UniProtKB/Swiss-Prot annotation:
GO terms for cellular component: plasma membrane. It holds the Pfam family Na_H_antiporter. The chain crosses the membrane at residues 9-29, 36-56, 71-91, 109-129, 137-157, 193-215, 257-277, 320-340, 353-375, 429-451. Its main location: membrane. It comes from the Bacteria. Is a secondary, electrogenic Na(+)/H(+) antiporter that catalyzes Na(+) uptake and proton efflux. Makes modest contributions to pH homeostasis in the alkaline range of pH but is not contributor to Na(+) resistance. Appears to have a repressive effect on growth and on alkaline phosphatases production in the presence of sodium, by affecting the transcription of the phoP/phoR two-component regulatory system. Belongs to the NhaC Na(+)/H(+) (TC 2.A.35) antiporter family. It comes from Bacillus subtilis (strain 168). This is Na(+)/H(+) antiporter NhaC. It is a multi-pass membrane protein. Keywords: Antiport, Cell membrane, Ion transport, Membrane, Sodium, Sodium transport, Transmembrane, Transmembrane helix, Transport. It is found in: Cell membrane. The lineage of its organism: Bacteria, Bacillati, Bacillota, Bacilli, Bacillales.
């Protein structure tokens, strides 16, 4: 921020609320994608910054620096799109889908999705890896079994984000513990206080949702037709699962995400050359670029196996660029710091401090769309207040995870939200009501802050 320019708290609140009104009204009243509303917010905030005396060079630098911070998420999203195309063509996702359709009852699908994604995400410590592997296959199963896709997406995301929050392998778990300067397992143990109640409520809710899914003869016949359609059109072989297995093993070894995804793409290409009889280099590269185009008379099967490719992620890539531009601009003109400074002045109790931490993490998520900033900025800002009031920092780190890690997938322009929507083919606004774990945890965190002394 320019040293001679400083926004006041009321002005920062006004600008922030006005931007949210633009975005929310466009999303819910006009039913448009979030790209242009975010772009309008960038234009509005740039004009306001010029009005308040910020030079254009400073505004431009904030926008450019923000986009620079989004380069890694953009690369990851692009690689995941390519990987899904590779796994579709090689047969990895069709094989997982066929096996799952053969053994999972439709009424049990939601709980199966929840617990299987919990296990994988805890092992690998990454919601993105979990969703791009088993999550995509489970969406295919739901499509064939007649289970609402938004319900299944909710279960997949709840399970995937459980590991993002609780796994010692997770980047965000280690990052939050590092911000609070506390041991990782002390941080994880303390998070049990909000995680276990939220998980139990989530399990109960998905149980009742799953119980409402019928498994009649027509549904069974439809599933068999989908299985036949997939087998006739795509490659179904257990050998294709070696590539997802490699990705999971590398993630468990804590190899960085970009090499992991690249290894998945390369290994899939090798397996395709060996085990896919109809393969050609041209067709494989086309699948990596544009996704698969298998021909089948079964419409449900076609929707499951014709997906992926680099181009499928371009909408999310452009969304993240605009969101990071907005976040960089807000940070450059001091809007975020002005909001946090104003919030901190009104804190008088432990409950208010915990609530302010959670809400600030949510606010930074909304402002920047970036998970790490939603942990870093409130964490650094509130750390001294926890020390001053003799409140253990594990309350800080838990609040950062509940408001930072878990909320990002609920924001259409957030990195995780944009990825989840693209990978699963379900808009964020559609799956939000069913991501119970993600919004129950912050509520419990705030409640405990006021109740537990």
């Amino acid at each position: 921020m320019d040293s001679q320019k400083k926004l006041t708290f009321p002005l920062a609140v006004g600008l922030f609320i006005f931007m949210l009104c633009i975005i929310i009204s466009c999303l819910f009243l006009l039913h448009v994608e979030p790209h242009i509303p975010l772009f309008l917010s960038v234009v509005m905030l740039s004009a306001a910054a010029l009005w308040f005396g910020f030079p254009w060079k400073s505004i431009e630098k904030g926008i450019v620096d923000g986009i620079k911070n989004g380069v890694q998420p953009i690369i990851v999203l692009a690689l995941i799109g390519i990987l899904i195309g590779a796994w579709m063509y090689s047969g990895a996702i069709p094989t997982m889908t066929v096996y799952a359709l053969s053994f999972i009852e439709p009424s049990h699908l939601l709980l199966t999705a929840l617990f299987s994604c919990m296990i994988i995400s805890t092992l690998v410590g990454s919601s993105l890896t979990t969703v791009s592997t088993i999550g995509v296959a489970l969406i295919g199963v739901a499509s064939a079994a007649g289970v609402p896709l938004e319900w299944t997406a909710g279960a997949v995301i709840c399970g995937a984000c459980f590991g993002d929050k609780m796994s010692p392998m997770s980047d965000t778990t280690n990052f939050a513990a590092g911000i609070g300067e506390i041991p990782i397992f002390e941080h994880i143990r303390h998070m049990m206080g909000t995680t276990i109640p939220a998980l139990l409520i989530t399990v109960v809710l998905f149980y009742f949702l799953g119980s409402s899914v019928s498994a009649d003869a027509a549904s069974t016949d439809n599933i068999q037709q989908v299985i036949t359609g997939i087998k006739d059109a795509a490659n179904v072989t257990p050998w294709a699962l070696l590539s997802p297995l490699l990705v999971v093993l590398l993630a468990m070894k804590r190899v960085s995400v970009i090499p992991v995804l690249t290894a998945g793409i390369i290994s899939s290409g090798i397996l395709t050359a060996i085990f896919v009889p109809y393969s050609s280099l041209q067709a494989f590269m086309t699948a990596l670029q544009n996704g698969t185009t298998f021909e089948t008379d079964n419409e449900a099967a076609a929707k499951i196996i014709n997906r992926g490719g680099l181009q499928s992620m371009m909408g999310s890539v452009s969304l993240i660029m605009i969101a990071f531009a907005l976040g960089g601009l807000m940070e450059k003109i001091g809007l975020i710091s002005a909001l946090l400074e104003g919030v901190m002045k009104g804190i008088r109790s432990k409950g208010r401090l915990v609530a302010a931490t959670v809400c600030s993490s949510i606010g930074v998520n909304l402002a920047t769309g970036e998970q790490y900033l939603s942990i870093l900025i409130p964490g650094q800002s509130f750390k001294s207040l926890y020390d001053k009031r003799n409140i253990q920092r594990k309350f800080l780190t838990r609040s950062l995870e509940d408001g930072g890690t878990l909320i990002n997938p609920l924001i259409p322009w957030g990195v995780s939200g944009a990825f989840m929507a693209s990978a699963l083919g379900v808009p964020v606004i559609d799956y939000i009501p069913f991501t119970f774990f993600l919004y129950i945890s912050p509520m419990i965190s705030i409640l405990i802050g006021f109740v537990k002394k």
